[in-house]
Amino acid sequence: MDEANIQDKERFASRENHCEIERRRRNKMTAYITELSDMVPTCSALARKPDKLTILRMAVAHMKALRGTGNTSSDGTYKPSFLTDQELKHLILEAADGFLFVVSCDSGRVIYVSDSVTPVLNYTQSDWYGTSLYEHIHPDDREKIREQLSTQESQNAGRILDLKSGTVKKEGHQSSMRLSMGARRGFICRMRVGNVNPESMVSGHLNRLKQRNSLGPSRDGTNYAVVHCTGYIKNWPPTDMFPNMHMERDVDDMSSHCCLVAIGRLQVTSTAANDMSGSNNQSEFITRHAMDGKFTFVDQRVLNILGYTPTELLGKICYDFFHPEDQSHMKESFDQVLKQKGQMFSLLYRARAKNSEYVWLRTQAYAFLNPYTDEVEYIVCTNSSGKTMHGAPLDAAAAHTPEQVQQQQQQEQHVYVQAAPGVDYARRELTPVGSATNDGMYQTHMLAMQAPTPQQQQQQQQRPGSAQTTPVGYTYDTTHSPYSAGGPSPLAKIPKSGTSPTPVAPNSWAALRPQQQQQQQQPVTEGYQYQQTSPARSPSGPTYTQLSAGNGNRQQAQPGAYQAGPPPPPNAPGMWDWQQAGGHPHPPHPTAHPHHPHAHPGGPAGAGQPQGQEFSDMLQMLDHTPTTFEDLNINMFSTPFE
């Protein structure tokens, strides 16, 4: 019995010894893995303590990264053999559009900076070397940079809280240093931009990139640029790492011997470029609206147009700022923007400015869609000043009512309605037969269907037929012309003829211009008159030659009148009967001719020189060989008739 008890005790003791040995072995393994976890930066960066397998896997990956496995050649070199260290460094910095700098972690003193800082920040290499990095950082970013350079705990140095067990563990200074050594650092900060002459810079790409990410002058007048810095916390670099730059260590820096080796690159921000078209346009602003019309974003340029600040509009309904007469159709337009997803709409309306006046705005609106859900997130509106509408200025203070707007639009539209049926040669070009040129002298107006009034028909019956007075080279219908401005052109009815019209001598216009301004005008005999609404077009006056049959077969054009062809045949005894002195009907409105001081018979000026003698003086000008209109360079419609 006693022997059995003794054997049981020995067996139990040996079992306890084995368990103790296993427990000590497991504790040692855990300690080594924990120490390995402290040495691997990726493990220490995790929020929770990883398991042993994760620690071992991250440790292997970190060792491969340190050895450069897979990134080196067979001889272990990190660069091509034909490149020196300096050439490789310049190539890397040029490709990265950045600069290399080394900063002491404790003091923040710049112990090295590459010469590529000049095209990036407009500072020379000597401007940065030996200075504090915090002097080149925006004041609001200095605390963040100080945290990035710190390698020790600020208050609880050497004391680490284990979140899993809830206990506080004491760690030595070496453990904290091991935690920081090799740690990657990456941050974005605002760095000061210097005043180096840009003409000395070689890279134009960096200048454009600097304009893209420049934040502009701050309150103190200093320009800042957004710089993205990436690097590692390292021990003090050996003296041969930067052979061209001498680096001295302060006495205070001997305690930590760590520094930040980083590359600074310009960070492209969402700030609009200065050279981009429309980005600095002060006559437009951008707004963003919710689906109910509330302002969720307002560009600060709204102050220049409406007088509001963005904070005065945020959260308010946009319909409250529209003109009461525009609110209904603006709501319908916004509904269409929401229904037609992504389609651009152009709107014109009146918005109330801060001074209670209504300003015309032209808005291009579209709905922004969520790319994942394909649902409308918000409405984006680009609002521009609507001071120009149909090419004419709009006065916001004068055009408040729809009646005024409609009247103003009608004035802007080119609508020309003739008082009598006829053709107005003022808009469309008509090239005479045989003419090689097509200038502004021969223009015809756009025609529109319009029935003649009874008074106009009576006047037309008193006038000679168009078939008798049409010059050679043109053929018109003998019926009354039912056309006026605004309708289709009758050019299809004009057949070509082989006879070239004969122009009037150009000197006759300039010589008789003073007489044109003093005398009254005669009415048009063929029912073709000019439009009087536009000063650029010819006013009413003699369009065709008003002739008189004097001495039987002799016919002449009055000076200053335009005749497009030779005179009509002599066998037309009745075409000038109304101009004869005795016993014949007079024209409907007998007035003095604008080019002659002699009035027609029956006119207010009385009888003058016989018509045959007047026209015989001009016959010699019409007997020459017919020529084209290329020699006639006088614009007959440019003379201002009174």
From Swiss-Prot:
<feature type="domain" description="PAS 2">
    <location>
        <begin position="271"/>
        <end position="341"/>
    </location>
</feature>
<feature type="compositionally biased region" description="Polar residues">
    <location>
        <begin position="463"/>
        <end position="482"/>
    </location>
</feature>
<dbReference type="GO" id="GO:0008286">
    <property type="term" value="P:insulin receptor signaling pathway"/>
</dbReference>
<dbReference type="Pfam" id="PF14598">
    <property type="entry name" value="PAS_11"/>
</dbReference>
<dbReference type="GO" id="GO:0016348">
    <property type="term" value="P:imaginal disc-derived leg joint morphogenesis"/>
</dbReference>
<dbReference type="GO" id="GO:0032991">
    <property type="term" value="C:protein-containing complex"/>
</dbReference>
<dbReference type="GO" id="GO:0048736">
    <property type="term" value="P:appendage development"/>
</dbReference>
<dbReference type="GO" id="GO:0005737">
    <property type="term" value="C:cytoplasm"/>
</dbReference>
<dbReference type="GO" id="GO:0007417">
    <property type="term" value="P:central nervous system development"/>
</dbReference>
<dbReference type="InterPro" id="IPR001067">
    <property type="entry name" value="Nuc_translocat"/>
</dbReference>
<dbReference type="GO" id="GO:0045944">
    <property type="term" value="P:positive regulation of transcription by RNA polymerase II"/>
</dbReference>
<dbReference type="InterPro" id="IPR011598">
    <property type="entry name" value="bHLH_dom"/>
</dbReference>
<dbReference type="Pfam" id="PF00010">
    <property type="entry name" value="HLH"/>
</dbReference>
<dbReference type="GO" id="GO:0000981">
    <property type="term" value="F:DNA-binding transcription factor activity, RNA polymerase II-specific"/>
</dbReference>
<dbReference type="GO" id="GO:0003700">
    <property type="term" value="F:DNA-binding transcription factor activity"/>
</dbReference>
<keyword id="KW-0804">Transcription</keyword>
<keyword id="KW-0539">Nucleus</keyword>
<dbReference type="GO" id="GO:0045676">
    <property type="term" value="P:regulation of R7 cell differentiation"/>
</dbReference>
<dbReference type="GO" id="GO:0032869">
    <property type="term" value="P:cellular response to insulin stimulus"/>
</dbReference>
<feature type="compositionally biased region" description="Polar residues">
    <location>
        <begin position="528"/>
        <end position="554"/>
    </location>
</feature>
<dbReference type="GO" id="GO:0006357">
    <property type="term" value="P:regulation of transcription by RNA polymerase II"/>
</dbReference>
<dbReference type="GO" id="GO:0000122">
    <property type="term" value="P:negative regulation of transcription by RNA polymerase II"/>
</dbReference>
<keyword id="KW-0238">DNA-binding</keyword>
<keyword id="KW-0805">Transcription regulation</keyword>
<dbReference type="GO" id="GO:0071456">
    <property type="term" value="P:cellular response to hypoxia"/>
</dbReference>
<dbReference type="Pfam" id="PF00989">
    <property type="entry name" value="PAS"/>
</dbReference>
<comment type="function">
    <text>Heterodimers of tgo/trh are involved in the control of breathless expression. Plays a role in the cellular or tissue response to oxygen deprivation.</text>
</comment>
<dbReference type="GO" id="GO:0007420">
    <property type="term" value="P:brain development"/>
</dbReference>
<keyword id="KW-0010">Activator</keyword>
<dbReference type="GO" id="GO:0000978">
    <property type="term" value="F:RNA polymerase II cis-regulatory region sequence-specific DNA binding"/>
</dbReference>
<dbReference type="GO" id="GO:0046982">
    <property type="term" value="F:protein heterodimerization activity"/>
</dbReference>
<dbReference type="GO" id="GO:0034751">
    <property type="term" value="C:aryl hydrocarbon receptor complex"/>
</dbReference>
<dbReference type="GO" id="GO:0090575">
    <property type="term" value="C:RNA polymerase II transcription regulator complex"/>
</dbReference>
<feature type="domain" description="PAS 1">
    <location>
        <begin position="85"/>
        <end position="156"/>
    </location>
</feature>
<dbReference type="InterPro" id="IPR050933">
    <property type="entry name" value="Circadian_TF"/>
</dbReference>
<keyword id="KW-0677">Repeat</keyword>
<feature type="region of interest" description="Disordered">
    <location>
        <begin position="450"/>
        <end position="612"/>
    </location>
</feature>
<dbReference type="GO" id="GO:0008347">
    <property type="term" value="P:glial cell migration"/>
</dbReference>
<feature type="domain" description="PAC">
    <location>
        <begin position="346"/>
        <end position="389"/>
    </location>
</feature>
<dbReference type="GO" id="GO:0048477">
    <property type="term" value="P:oogenesis"/>
</dbReference>
<dbReference type="InterPro" id="IPR035965">
    <property type="entry name" value="PAS-like_dom_sf"/>
</dbReference>
<dbReference type="InterPro" id="IPR036638">
    <property type="entry name" value="HLH_DNA-bd_sf"/>
</dbReference>
